[in-house]
Amino acid sequence: MSRIGKLPVKIPEKVKVSVDGNLVKVEGPKGKMSFPTNPRVKVAVDKGEVQVTRPDDSPESKGLHGLTRTLVKNALDGVVKGYERGLEINGVGFKAEVKGKEIHFALGFSHPVVFKLPEGVTAEVDAKQTKLTVKGVDKHVLGLTAAKIRALRPPEPYKGKGIKYAEEIIRRKEGKTGAA
């Protein structure tokens, strides 16, 4: 058995989990989400916990077993605690501003960049407008959103200008030494 997949997932208080065919629905205090599962694995809810089982020991089934259990665990954690990802904006005149469901960036281009946030994702900017925090219930959507924001102006290795993850370390390069 998969070491991760065979562990049952305890359902926290104030959380409802329902399985409808291959669709798992999770509702909690922070919000609700649903995601499809592969038909090769079965998800069952009983006695306050979620159990994931697989029909055989093929390599594909083993992989899907652990994956499905982790997706269920992430969904439960998301509706209880939520997820967040920090981004930092480095560069002279580079800043961000949240306006409703949009983030307006000044990233050194000749025009402002407007990024529309997907459903279920919120953003906050600090007072200096250089630290951005995106929050959401769905870990997958949150990661994709953070990656798309970073891709607007990836950090460059010479001066470190651009948008980077808060915990990311940029390997810096030396510039040209000049003609001798």
Curated annotation (Swiss-Prot):
PANTHER family: 60S/50S RIBOSOMAL PROTEIN L6/L9, LARGE RIBOSOMAL SUBUNIT PROTEIN UL6M. This is Large ribosomal subunit protein uL6. The lineage of its organism: Bacteria, Pseudomonadati, Myxococcota, Myxococcia, Myxococcales. One of its GO terms (biological process) is cytoplasmic translation. The keyword Glycoprotein does not apply. Belongs to the universal ribosomal protein uL6 family. This protein binds to the 23S rRNA, and is important in its secondary structure. It is located near the subunit interface in the base of the L7/L12 stalk, and near the tRNA binding site of the peptidyltransferase center. GO terms for cellular component: cytosolic large ribosomal subunit. InterPro entries: Ribosomal_uL6-like, Ribosomal_uL6-like_a/b-dom_sf, Ribosomal_uL6_a/b-dom, Ribosomal_uL6_bac-type, Ribosomal_uL6_CS. It comes from Anaeromyxobacter sp. (strain Fw109-5). SUPFAM superfamilies: Ribosomal protein L6 (SSF56053). Part of the 50S ribosomal subunit. Keywords: Ribonucleoprotein, Ribosomal protein, RNA-binding, rRNA-binding. Pfam families: Ribosomal_L6. One of its GO terms (molecular function) is rRNA binding. The keyword Lipid metabolism does not apply.
